[in-house]
Amino acid sequence: MQAFKKKLQQLVYSFSTEDRYADYDEEAANPDVAAGVERSITESNHGSQIQLADYVDGSNPSGNEGINEALLAWRHIDNWTSQHNPDLAATLSDPCTRHDINNAEKDLDIIFPASVRASLRLHDGQEDLVSMTGTGGLFFGLQLMGLDEIVQMTRTWRNVAENLERKNHELQIKMDKHQELNGTTVDLPNQQKGYGKLENQDYKAMDPNLQRNISQNYKKQFKLPDIPDQHSVPPLAIQQVYANSGWIPLVTDNAGNHIGIDLAPGPKGKYGQVILFGREFDTKFVVASNWGDFLLSFANDLELGNWLLIDEGNDQFAGEGELVFRDKKSNGPVRDYLEVLVMRSRMKWNSFTERKLPEEPKRTVSSSQGSQNTVEPAEQQETALTVDETLDEKNDTSLSVDNTGTKQEVKDPETTGTKTGSSAKAEDNLPKTSNPDEVMADGADTQETSKHEQNESTNAVENTETSQEGAVETSEKPEEKPKKQSKKASKKKGKKDEKKDTDSKTKEPEVEEETESHLANSVEKLKDDFENVAL
């Protein structure tokens, strides 16, 4: 009798309640049917009569963002679908009740963000997609999931996450045991019949390379399925795992990929952010900060005209066609909406990094300037050698002009030695005139000898002049060789030889002045001696 009574109450409850997910609760004698929002057709299209108290979480004010965006987005979506694709509008389900949402949260042990609650209180996903041909998912072919589907798919992904975590844990335990037993006994990974631990005495009688071979293949026996490394965009915004119990799917492509909310974000993520995850997404993407912003971006695409209705068949009763994405501005081809969301997520992250790092170009410029300004020692030596070579060429030209113009300049101290030697010979040839009385006593003999000596002195002076000219010419020739040698030596030895050349050049004018003064004195002395002899 009690069982029949319970069945009758469940039947009455199913006809009288607006709950779509929650079942009849025997403990609640008076289920909160009135708590569901009574809406007319216009209210279902616009959602204007829904009170915020129906889905606002008073205990978590920070989780209430996105409510206004969700209400505004659904107003535009309902208007657009009723105008352009009534068949698509007919697939949108009736709203959930608060009782449905509370039971779903209890089953999943979560609390939906306020924007998700608002969306479920307007439309509980899509239905009748199979019976209504010519229509597809609301989000450019992606289906909006109902509350019942959300709970079932969340449990499925949680089972995947738990299995992966359990396998990782088992693998870690077995690896630890293998490391402990390595060297004493061999723990074979295969636990079938006929396999077990080998004692030390048995192990010695077997192949000595057995333990090494087992250790090399040990990881292969317990290797997980081929799951590549997981990433996220932006980095660290989403946990880098294949599946997580905090990811709640809300939209599906019916192929294992989802758009959902993240209730367990990464270190740099945000609670309630909208992400892309699934079988084909080893890199997870953040597409919106909350569910309301995502709905508003979809409504914006509809208002901008980024859509097409494609009817692949000729059936007149098939409806207007399936809604697909096409960028109106670029007049591009039809694109998958998941690919569009991935592209937008990458572009948003790239623009964010460019704004966040404005100093990076400056640093590169400064480093390049610094590298240009810094000259290596070898380069400095080469530049110094080229400058010195040009200076040497200028000095060569100036010296050649001086040598051709004035032959009396003497630049080699060796020439001074020849000149002084010739003057000394001339002085030896001259007679001693220290006693004038002897000269007067001799008379005519002295005059003859004086004439003879005068001729000899003039010849000596001419010989000295010719010797001077020869000395100047010889001094000019050896000077060219040291300069050529100094150029070669400066290229090889560098700055040390250059300093020596500059020192020798500074000493040359001093030597020239000394030789000129000494030559002038010797010439004047010869003139005085000649005058005395003549007298």
UniProtKB/Swiss-Prot annotation:
Biased composition (Basic residues): 484-494
Domain of life, per lineage: Eukaryota
Region (Disordered): 354-535
Coiled coil segments of this chain: none
Stretches with biased composition (Polar residues): 364-384, 397-407, 456-469
An individual GO BP term: fungal-type cell wall beta-glucan biosynthetic process
Gene3D superfamilies: SMI1/KNR4-like
Biased composition (Basic and acidic residues): 354-363, 474-483, 495-509, 524-535
SMART domains: SMI1_KNR4 (SM00860)
InterPro entries cross-referenced by the UniProt entry: Knr4/Smi1, Knr4/Smi1-like_dom, Knr4/Smi1-like_sf, KNR4/SMI1_regulator
CC per GO annotation: mating projection tip
Family affiliation: Belongs to the KNR4/SMI1 family.
PANTHER family: CELL WALL ASSEMBLY REGULATOR SMI1
Protein name (Swiss-Prot/TrEMBL): KNR4/SMI1 homolog
Annotated organism of origin: Kluyveromyces lactis (strain ATCC 8585 / CBS 2359 / DSM 70799 / NBRC 1267 / NRRL Y-1140 / WM37) (Yeast)
